[in-house]
């Protein structure tokens, strides 16, 4: 389990308690810190602390933790989120399926655990991440093992060797897009993801990345152009989304930072599009997972 602490240190001990209480035997726990931690309970030794320093972002934390880990699978669990009993065992029931590279937990609302915060995420190719089944009551709801779903911001399980072969997380991306980008890289390499409804994480909506400021707008635009199919209809839908979000930024006093961020993201990514070519990675990845070629698949997870 890799726990990144990015401006969330006061919540660390709650996350650790849930992991240590419900974690399987011999579970390796790695905490990547953005500020000093006094370790008042003397957990050093039982837990690996990586002191990455100020300015840490989720992508950097994922890469540091992944290199320090030793297991076949890692669970990237941002600090402030809490796991439930048997969460890891239920997720890793999929571990032997060579087609699966990402396992997505069901995230429930920590304020009301009878409500779904996200049964994974979808991606609207106009440039927007969409919470799946947000606000739906768990009572009377049957959740399937939905495939090709993106992770919520509360984290996911990844095949560690495959993630390393893909080059890790892109540290130029903002926190709100890192897990989606990593998962889409898995899709491009021929793997799928799966939602495991019995792997439950309690997430706080207050921890979800939001905003209309410069950085948020830049990161959103950069992600769009990285994964866009460049079709005319897609561009038109994206322009409609930009218009709506620009108008929404106006009453928040973020109009010009938002516009500047969008322009910066476009300049940085529009000319290059998909920056990673995974054609040379397939054989290396297969050596880590199976003797057969992974299935071909389009790589955009649809919303809805």
Label each region the model flagged:
Residues 124-149, 153:
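Short, flexible, basic/aromatic active-site loop/helix in glycosyltransferases
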Residues 214-216, 229-304:
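Non-catalytic, C-terminal membrane-associated alpha-helical segments of glycosyltransferases
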Residues 17-26:
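Short, acidic, metal-binding catalytic loop of nucleotide-sugar glycosyltransferases
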Residues 52-69, 79:
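Glycine-rich, basic loop-to-helix element that forms the pyrophosphate-binding segment
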Residues 91, 148-167, 172-200:
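A short, conserved alpha-helix in the catalytic core of glycosyltransferases
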Residues 82, 86-124:
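Conserved donor NDP-sugar-binding/catalytic core segment of glycosyltransferases
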Residues 189-192, 196-211, 219-223:
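Active-site donor/metal-binding and catalytic loop motifs
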């Amino acid at each position: 389990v890799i726990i990144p602490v990015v401006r969330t240190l006061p919540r660390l001990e709650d996350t650790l308690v849930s992991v240590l209480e419900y974690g399987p035997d011999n579970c390796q726990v790695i905490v990547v810190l953005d500020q000093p931690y006094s370790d008042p309970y003397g957990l050093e030794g039982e837990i690996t602390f990586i002191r990455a320093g100020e300015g840490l972002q989720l992508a950097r934390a994922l890469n540091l933790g992944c290199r320090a880990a030793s297991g076949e699978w890692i669970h990237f669990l941002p600090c402030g989120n809490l796991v439930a009993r048997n969460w890891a065992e239920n997720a890793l029931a999929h571990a032997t399926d060579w087609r699966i590279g990402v396992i997505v937990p069901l995230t429930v609302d920590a304020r009301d655990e009878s409500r779904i915060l996200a049964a994974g995420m979808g991606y609207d190719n106009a440039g927007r991440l969409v919470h799946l089944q947000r606000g739906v009551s768990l009572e009377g709801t049957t959740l399937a093992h939905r495939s090709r779903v993106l992770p919520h911001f509360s984290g996911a399980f990844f095949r560690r060797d495959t993630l390393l072969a893909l080059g890790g997380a892109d540290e130029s991306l903002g926190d709100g897009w890192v897990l989606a980008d990593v998962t889409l890289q898995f899709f491009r390499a021929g793997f799928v993801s799966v939602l495991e409804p019995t792997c439950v994480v309690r997430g706080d909506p207050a921890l979800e990345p939001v905003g209309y400021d410069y950085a948020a707008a830049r990161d959103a635009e950069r992600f769009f152009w990285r994964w866009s199919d460049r079709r005319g209809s897609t561009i038109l839908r994206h322009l409609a989304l930009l218009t709506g979000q620009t108008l929404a930024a106006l009453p928040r006093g973020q109009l010009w930072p938002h516009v500047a961020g969008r322009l910066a993201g476009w300049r940085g990514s529009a000319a290059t599009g998909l920056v990673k070519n995974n054609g040379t990675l397939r054989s290396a990845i297969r050596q880590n997972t199976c003797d057969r070629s992974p299935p071909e698949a389009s790589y955009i997870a649809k919303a809805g």
